[in-house]
Amino acid sequence: MTRPVHACPLVSRKAPPLSGKVHVPGDKSISHRALMLSALAVGESFVEGLLEGEDVLATAEAMRSMGADIRKDEKGCWHIHGVGVGSLLQPQNALDMGNSGTSTRLLMGVVASHPITATFIGDASLSKRPMGRISTPLSLMGARFSAAEGNRLPMTVTGLYPAIPIEYRLPVASAQVKSAILLAGLNTPGITRVIEPVPTRDHSERMLKGYGANLSVEENDGVRIISIHGEAELKPQHIIVPGDPSSAAFLVVAGLIVPGSDLIVENVGLNPTRSGLYTMLKAMGGQIEYLNPREVGGEPVADLSVKYSHLKAIDVPPSIVPSMIDEFPILFIAAAMAEGKSTLQGLAELRVKESDRIAVMAEGLKALGVSLEEKEDGLIIEGSAGEGLGQKGKMVSIAAHLDHRIAMSFAVAGLVSEGGVTIDDRRPIMTSFPVFGQLFKELGAEFEMGLVK
C-alpha cells in the first residue's frame, strides 16, 4: 500500500546528565497477544496497561473487523468481548497492518484455520518484508495464499476448516512463526506441534495456557517441543501488561552512556526470553540494578536503576541472540561508546526487519565517525571509549528508513554527539513508543521536533 510521505524530523543534541524516574509503557508483544486471545475467548476480557502505539491499535482494529467488540473505558482499561475460537467473521475490508509485522504474521495464523478470507495490507516498510516463512507452514495446514511478488504484502489468506494439524520444525529462530502456527492450531482438530531448536520469546505459550488452551511444552537437549490440542474454548481473562523491555532499552542505554546520569526505569518486563540485552550490558560493565522484583500478569518485572558507566567491548554469544533480536540497534550504539572492539554477529535476521538494520546502522554509525566492519550477519565495532560521537559543529543527518528502532537508536546517539544528530522522520516511533520523547524530557533531554515537511 502506498501512502504519501510527510517527514517529521527529530533533532537530538548532547545532553546533560539524565536523572529521575520514568515508567515504561506496556509491552508490545504481550499487548498484541492479549487483544488476539481476548477476541478468541468466550466472554469479556479486561486488559490494563495496553500499549497504545500504532502497531497494537492496528491489531485491535483487525480483531474488530472479524467480530470482536473492543473499547477503552474512561480509566484506560480495555474491554474485549470475544467471539470464540472458530467464530470469527469475514472482514468486509482489507486489514491495514500499518508497520506491524507482528500483527500481520500472527493474524495470518489466526485466519489460517477459520473459514474466512482476509487481505493484509501495510505501509511501504511492511510491504517490503518477506512473508514466505509464515505462508510455508500455514499452507501445510491447508490455508491458501495469494501475494505480491516475493511473498510480500498485499497478501490474501483463505483459511481452511477443518485445518490440518502439522508437526513443524522451525528452520530459523522466530517467535512470530511459532506463534502463527500455534494460533492456527487453536481451531485445528488434533495436535499441532512446533519444534523449536533455539528458544525464542515465550509470551504466546504463557498466555495461551493462561486463557485455557490445552498446550504443553517439553524440553529435550535444549530443543523445545510445543504441542497444542485444538478446539479448546478460551476463557476470558484480566490481563495486566508489564512494561516493554525493548522500549526500556533506549532509556537504559542512554543512562549508561550520558556522563553523570543516574535514573530509574520502572515496570520493566524481564521475561528470560527477552532480557538478553540487559545481560550483555551488565557484562560490558553497565551499572544496572534490579529493584523491587515482582510478577505482573505472570511475567517477571523489576524497576531498573541505571548509572553512567565506562563500558567495555563485548562479543555476543550466538545462544543469546534470540532473546535480544530487537535490541541490537541500540546495543550497536552502546558498543560505539565502549572501550575496545565489539563483535556482534549471528544477526542475519536483522536484514529482514523493518529495514536492513545491519546496513542502516552501519551507515549511520560511520556518519558519526565510528570505525566498524560490516559483515553479512552483523557488525564489528571499534568503540570510542566514552568519547563523544561525531565532530563539533557538524550536524549528522540519519535516514530512519521508516524503522522505529533505527530512529530511536540514533536519537539516543545524538545525546552523546559532538555536533548533534537529525533523524529524517520521527513518525515511525509512534508505532511502538509514542511517549518516547516525553519520557526523555522528564529525564532532562529534550529533542527538537521539526515541522511536517
Swiss-Prot record:
GO cellular component, one term: cytoplasm
The protein's Enzyme Commission number: 2.5.1.19
CDD domains: EPSP_synthase
Residues that, per the record, bind 3-phosphoshikimate: 28-29, 33, 174, 176, 326, 353
Subcellular location as annotated: Cytoplasm
InterPro entries for the chain: Enolpyruvate_Tfrase_dom, Enolpyruvate_Tfrase_sf, EPSP_synthase, EPSP_synthase_CS, RNA3'P_cycl/enolpyr_Trfase_a/b
Positions annotated as active site in the UniProt record: 326
Catalytic activity: 3-phosphoshikimate + phosphoenolpyruvate = 5-O-(1-carboxyvinyl)-3-phosphoshikimate + phosphate
Subcellular location, principal: cytoplasm
Metabolic or biological pathway, per its Swiss-Prot or TrEMBL entry: Metabolic intermediate biosynthesis; chorismate biosynthesis; chorismate from D-erythrose 4-phosphate and phosphoenolpyruvate: step 6/7
Residues where phosphoenolpyruvate binds: 28, 101, 129, 176, 357, 405
Oxidoreductase among keywords: no
GO molecular function: 3-phosphoshikimate 1-carboxyvinyltransferase activity
Pfam families: EPSP_synthase
Gene Ontology terms: biological process: amino acid biosynthetic process; aromatic amino acid family biosynthetic process; chorismate biosynthetic process
Superkingdom in the source lineage: Bacteria
Keywords: Amino-acid biosynthesis, Aromatic amino acid biosynthesis, Cytoplasm, Transferase
Subunit structure: Monomer.
PANTHER family, per the entry: AROM/DEHYDROQUINATE SYNTHASE, PENTAFUNCTIONAL AROM POLYPEPTIDE
Record-linked HAMAP family: EPSP_synth (MF_00210)
Family recorded in the similarity comment: Belongs to the EPSP synthase family.
Role: Catalyzes the transfer of the enolpyruvyl moiety of phosphoenolpyruvate (PEP) to the 5-hydroxyl of shikimate-3-phosphate (S3P) to produce enolpyruvyl shikimate-3-phosphate and inorganic phosphate.
Protein name listed in UniProt: 3-phosphoshikimate 1-carboxyvinyltransferase
Species assigned in the record: Zymomonas mobilis subsp. mobilis (strain ATCC 31821 / ZM4 / CP4)
